[in-house]
Amino acid sequence: HPRSSAASDVYKRQIMKPDIKNVNSKNIVDFIGSIFERRGGEEYLGERVTMGQHMLQGATMAEQSKEPDDIIIGALLHDIGHFTSEFGTFSMEDKEDRYHEDAGAAVLEHFFPKIITDCCRYHVAAKRYLCATNPEYFQKLSIASVHSLNLQGGPMSKTEVKEFERNPNLKKILTVRLYDDAGKIPDM
């Protein structure tokens, strides 16, 4: 029996979502590699690059700038939650946040140092922070990034800014955020 289009779409999403139950320290690199291989060609949130291109571009730019390994790895893995989230991937039609930063951090925290996990967990907060503290930053955001910002709570309040500034990894998180923003170059 042929599947209906809707049933086929549900089936595809189920087989595309990675199985994280059996991930361990011996297979985490293969697990991440398989995500890039299987899903890296997916659209990146209304941008003109794929998800894989976006993540690799950020890491490549960090490496070319001679950043430390934790920044390079943070830039590479910051959006891994788009692939591991129970809620699926973001689209421009979304009306609710999908919390990909939390989904990614939940996987990474078992295998990577806290700084890597923090770069994933707080890169959305970093965008909200930069929008609240630097008006020029907001002006540079893409249409897709503004859309996701609105779903993610908009610019931080003054109270949120003060709380976020207490994070001991603030500088590195903000650095990864800037590579996140930069990694959207078609044909790089």
Residue ranges of each PLM-predicted region?
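Metal-dependent phosphohydrolase cores
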Residues: 15-188
